[in-house]
A protein has these predicted regions:
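Membrane-embedded transmembrane alpha-helical bundles that form the catalytic cores
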Residues: 1-166
Length: 166
C-alpha cells in the first residue's frame, strides 16, 4: 500500500546519501589521494594529519552514504531497515566506536565469524593450553585474539581489498 511518508522519507534519505557520497566523500577522496599519492611533495606533519582526518570523514561519508541510499530505497517500498551507523565519531571509547560503526556488518561478523571461531574445538583447546601455560588472564587474552583478528581481517577485506582497510 502506498504511503506518502515512505515516499518522502525514502527520497530524502536517498538524496542525503548521494550528497554524502558524491559531494563530501568524492571531494575529500581527491584531496586525500593527492596528499597520500604525492607524499614526497608535502613536508611537515600538518598535511598528513589533515589528510588522515579527511580520510576518516571520507570513509564515513562513503559508507554511510551508500547505506542511506540503500535504506532510502527500501523505505520507498515500505521496508524499514535497521540503522547502520550510529554517529560513531561521537563515541567516547574505541569499543563504543566499533559498536556504532557499520552496526549490521559488525553484528553479522559477530554472529557468523567471531562466535563460531570462539566456540570451535580448536579455540577451546587453545584456551586450555594457553591458560595452563600463561595463566588464566593472559591465556584468555591469547585464545580470544584469534577470533578478533579473524573478524578484523575479514571486515577490512569487506570494506575494500586494499592494505589500508586490512
Amino acid at each position: 500500500r502506498f504511503e506518502y511518508d515512505n515516499l518522502r522519507d525514502g527520497a530524502l534519505l536517498i538524496l542525503w546519501g548521494f550528497a554524502k557520497k558524491l559531494i563530501l566523500a568524492e571531494r575529500l577522496g581527491t584531496f586525500v589521494d593527492q596528499i597520500y599519492g604525492n607524499y614526497t611533495q608535502y613536508t611537515g606533519m600538518l598535511f598528513f594529519f589533515v589528510a588522515t582526518a579527511a580520510f576518516s570523514i571520507q570513509i564515513y561519508a562513503d559508507f554511510s552514504g551508500c547505506m542511506d541510499i540503500a535504506t532510502g530505497t527500501a523505505r520507498l517500498f515500505g521496508i524499514r531497515l535497521a540503522p547502520n551507523f550510529l554517529r560513531p565519531y561521537f563515541s567516547k571509547t574505541m569499543p563504543e566506536f566499533w559498536r556504532r560503526w557499520h552496526v549490521t556488518l559488525g553484528n553479522w561478523f559477530k554472529d557468523y565469524v567471531f562466535y563460531p571461531i570462539s566456540i570451535s574445538k580448536f579455540s577451546l583447546d587453545l584456551n586450555k593450553k594457553a591458560r595452563k601455560r600463561f595463566g588464566n588472564e593472559f591465556g584468555r587474552i591469547v585464545s580470544s585474539a584469534i577470533p578478533i583478528l579473524a573478524v578484523w581481517l575479514l571486515t577490512g577485506i569487506w570494506h575494500g581489498p586494499d592494505w589500508k582497510y586490512v
